[in-house]
Amino acid sequence: MNGQPVRVTVVIDHPAQHFTRALQLLSAEPGVQVHVYYWSAAERVRDAGFARSVSWDVDLLRGYPWRAPEPGRSMSGRIRWLVRQLRARRPQVLICYGWASPIARLALLYCMLTRIPVVLYGDTTWQHSAAQGRHRVLRALVLRVLMRASAGAISTGAFNREFYISCGMDPRRIWPGVCPADTELFGMARAGSRTPPGAGRTPLRIGFAGKLIARKGVDELLRAAALLPSTRDWSVTVVGDGPLMPELQALAAELGLAERVTFRGFANTTEMPALLAAFDVMVVPSRWDMRALVTIEAMAAGAAVIVSDATAVWGPGDLVEDGVSGLVYRSGDPAALGRQLSRLLEDPGLLATLRRTAAARVAEFGPDAFARTMASAIRTLHERAKATTGP
């Protein structure tokens, strides 16, 4: 691209671990000049899903330009702050992560009034939308207006692309993209060659990582594990915390799994690569979920994955292809999950193949792919705008 770089503003509610490296790489892309605006950049936040205050042990704000309002500002003060920032910045393209947060709604309204092209980015699916339940019809109408008013969207998977199209987005204005995890970091922790589970009395190490809340389906994993043969060597490790911790511990005891299931508790960012690399298989038993980035992290760390069909990470050409780069089972059916676990317990060759394929597949879902696809969409959109309105 010749001339000045495209001025790009990215609006996000708060910093997140999986975006840090991606934003660093996007900021380094040629032809784009990126500034990130947060609604809050607080270093310690209360996370209801983990049932605790969380302070991540990595710097989420290093390596890219960003701004956020001072802590303690009122809502009206934050609104005035963002409007001043957008007026001063004069973005040529605005990337909006989601549309439900205050910063997203304000930025979208500002851009509609000032005719700044907006590119939508997120991981919503119709399954997630239906799960919201309330005001469904009104929400659908608002989304249709938003899709038609936006310059385009970045899809983060087949289900997300279908969501945009069903809301009225022209498929020609949807670019393929990535909802990234730091695949390089987790790949570095990948376990080396080890004795296949079942050979030499090596146990099958089954894992879960995430918030202990109802929709994550950890109870389903425990019920499935209870169906595995007690004569075989296997274990389950649950990494994470949340309001259901006591209930899940009681369920494990009730199912006779107290000696096989370990509740590791909350793990911070720098602890996760080694924990996931220690798993033979990661289970994502969500009752509904969007991109479930822990799936990418586990695959990069060398684990095979089993995901429920209520996640949005599977399907032809997506992250998990059933029987190729992972296994899929019907959500709500512990027996089906138990059968998939039994397959890996009985067939070390299948497990080894899935682990190798998973580690190779995630190369397409890392922060470099995010930066590359996002920058390509920005350049294309800017060139189209110039062709329509002139430089």
What residue spans do the PLM features occupy?
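Conserved acidic donor-binding segment of nucleotide-sugar-dependent glycosyltransferases
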Residues: 321-323, 327-334, 342-349
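Conserved donor-binding/catalytic core segment of Leloir-type glycosyltransferases
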Residues: 198-216, 222-225, 237
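Donor nucleotide-sugar binding/catalytic pocket of nucleotide-sugar-dependent glycosyltransferases
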Residues: 136, 147-194, 201
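Short hydrophobic beta-strand element within catalytic cores of glycosyltransferases
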Residues: 304-311
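Short alpha-helical donor nucleotide-sugar binding micro-motif in glycosyltransferases
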Residues: 266-267, 274-279
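Nucleotide-sugar donor phosphate/pyrophosphate-binding loop at the beta->alpha transition
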Residues: 117-119, 126-149, 191
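A short, well-ordered alpha-helix in the C-terminal region of glycosyltransferases
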Residues: 260, 336, 343, 350-364
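Aromatic "clamp/platform" in nucleotide-sugar-dependent glycosyltransferases that forms part
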Residues: 287
